[in-house]
């Protein structure tokens, strides 16, 4: 099968979040299964700085962005049997960052037009065209309303993945003519209109053959007013083509048996190295060395979305318990201040590291006993999967991808891979922590069984890849 991904970012070239991870991993997994896979993304200045000497200049052409006749440079690099095509235009993409400019609408309108015209130029007409988030959300619409006259494009099937429904691409309706060069009929009849704006994401939901998001529970949640960010009605209307597929993690890179960031390696059948990592981390961060004290790890952005309001509300209570806690991350200033204050008040119990350090993050996953992640909402989440891979049991709010990946401890049969609570409040977070501490302190065999079960879970991209492959095959 010929599959083309079009996205605004992709690891290792340019990455700001989970979308970059997906574009770095999913095409590679599909290629391993024998599919012909290409990725199209912008050629940012940071790509040129890091990879410019490896990338081949292929061709150039011009595209019309409304009245603007714009240069489209095409560069190419093959990596892991995936061919990356980069759209080069220094005016649009040499900004020192990926997103956040006043003219993002024009930048990504240009990118989508260039990507669609590129297919014919490189003679790669995909069976499936997979686009991601609002930056590429107009492609299914353009394919059917602007480029339908190109016969070779008529059999292309489209998949749109929502990584973050919050950013929908809402712009003035004049953009249809001014940038995309199409009439306003689909805006006037309401198809593309939302809150008196042109809404790119709404266009993708209506025009794509399939819509996916990054976990089954989140796919259900975005059909509700609480999580749908205004598009819940459209999601319910198009529910028949909506599904959720959990993202994977790189299980080769994230491996406690080989991780180069760890002082000691370990496996699910021999956890001695995990205990040594705990003692090493305690020493490194100035906490009393004690292999028996339950160590709680947090690696996160410090925001309300990640549940730090309820953590902060119970932090004093938590630190009254016989625990140690290590926090790593940056975010809202008041949360940074709160954790710094409590670290000075409880220096033998709390280490607050208000920074981001990849090496320390890996060491926290490996050393901690409990990984706290009570997000208010979480489309997928990777940290809980990484924690389980390293034998740290997640304590999560049952929402989105957390609900789909963490199996709550069952005290009757010992099943589970972590601990969870349903009602989003500090009280239930605290009650669930007390349960986890009781199991850790009083039932060590049950705890070891939970660790074994967590470390046995397969969250690799190979598993996620099978689900995408089945989805693509349904479209043929």
Swiss-Prot record:
It comes from the Bacteria. Its EC number is 2.4.1.21. Keywords: Glycogen biosynthesis, Glycosyltransferase, Transferase. SUPFAM superfamilies: UDP-Glycosyltransferase/glycogen phosphorylase. Transmembrane segments: none annotated. One of its GO terms (molecular function) is alpha-1,4-glucan glucosyltransferase (ADP-glucose donor) activity. One of its GO terms (biological process) is glycogen biosynthetic process. Pfam families: Glyco_transf_5 (PF08323), Glycos_transf_1 (PF00534). Pathway: Glycan biosynthesis; glycogen biosynthesis. InterPro entries: Glyco_trans_1, GS/SS, Starch_synth_cat_dom. It catalyses: [(1->4)-alpha-D-glucosyl](n) + ADP-alpha-D-glucose = [(1->4)-alpha-D-glucosyl](n+1) + ADP + H(+). The keyword rRNA-binding does not apply. ADP-alpha-D-glucose binds at residue 15. Belongs to the glycosyltransferase 1 family. Bacterial/plant glycogen synthase subfamily. Synthesizes alpha-1,4-glucan chains using ADP-glucose. This is Glycogen synthase. The lineage of its organism: Bacteria, Bacillati, Bacillota, Bacilli, Lactobacillales. The gene is glgA.
């Amino acid at each position: 099968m010929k599959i083309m991904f079009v996205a605004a970012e992709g690891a290792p070239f340019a990455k700001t979040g989970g979308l970059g991870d997906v574009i770095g991993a999913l095409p590679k997994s599909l290629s391993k299964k024998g599919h012909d896979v290409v990725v199209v993304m912008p050629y940012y200045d940071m790509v040129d700085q890091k990879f410019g000497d490896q990338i081949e200049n292929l061709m150039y052409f011009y595209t019309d962005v409304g009245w603007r006749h714009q240069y489209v440079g095409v560069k190419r690099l093959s990596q892991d049997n995936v061919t990356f095509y980069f759209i080069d235009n220094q005016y649009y993409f040499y900004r020192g960052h990926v997103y956040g400019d006043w003219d993002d609408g024009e930048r990504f309108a240009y990118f989508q037009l260039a990507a669609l015209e590129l297919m014919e130029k490189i003679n790669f007409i995909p069976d499936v065209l997979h686009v991601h988030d609002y930056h590429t959300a107009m492609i299914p619409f353009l394919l059917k309303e602007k480029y339908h006259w190109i016969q070779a494009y008529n059999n292309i099937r489209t998949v749109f993945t929502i990584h973050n429904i919050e950013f929908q691409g809402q712009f003035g309706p004049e953009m249809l003519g001014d940038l995309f060069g199409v009439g306003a009929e689909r805006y006037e009849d309401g198809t593309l209109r939302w809150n008196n704006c042109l809404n790119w994401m709404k266009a993708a939901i209506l025009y794509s053959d399939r819509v996916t998001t990054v976990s089954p529970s989140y796919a259900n949640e975005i059909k509700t007013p609480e999580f749908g960010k205004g598009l819940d009605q459209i999601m319910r209307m198009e529910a028949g083509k909506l599904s959720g597929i959990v993202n994977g993690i790189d299980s080769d890179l994230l491996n406690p048996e080989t991780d180069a960031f760890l002082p000691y390696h370990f496996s699910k059948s021999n956890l001695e190295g995990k205990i040594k990592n705990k003692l090493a981390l305690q020493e490194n961060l100035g906490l009393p060395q004690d292999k028996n004290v339950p160590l709680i790890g947090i690696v996160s952005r410090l925001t309300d979305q990640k549940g730090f309001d309820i953590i902060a509300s119970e932090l004093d209570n938590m630190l009254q318990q016989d625990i140690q806690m290590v926090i790593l991350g940056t975010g809202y200033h008041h949360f940074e201040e709160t954790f710094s204050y409590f670290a000075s008040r409880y220096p033998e119990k709390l280490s607050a590291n208000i920074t981001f350090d990849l090496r320390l993050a890996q060491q926290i996953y490996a050393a901690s006993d409990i990984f706290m992640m009570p997000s208010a909402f979480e489309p997928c989440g990777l940290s809980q999967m990484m924690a389980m891979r390293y034998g740290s049991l997640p304590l999560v709010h049952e929402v989105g991808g957390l609900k789909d990946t963490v199996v709550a401890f069952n005290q009757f049969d010992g099943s589970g891979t972590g601990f969870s609570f349903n009602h989003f409040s500090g009280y239930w977070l605290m009650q669930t922590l007390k349960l986890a501490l009781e199991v850790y302190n009083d039932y060590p065999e049950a705890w070891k069984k939970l660790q074994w079960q967590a470390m046995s879970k397969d969250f690799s991209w190979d598993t996620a890849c099978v689900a995408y492959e089945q989805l693509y095959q349904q479209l043929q």
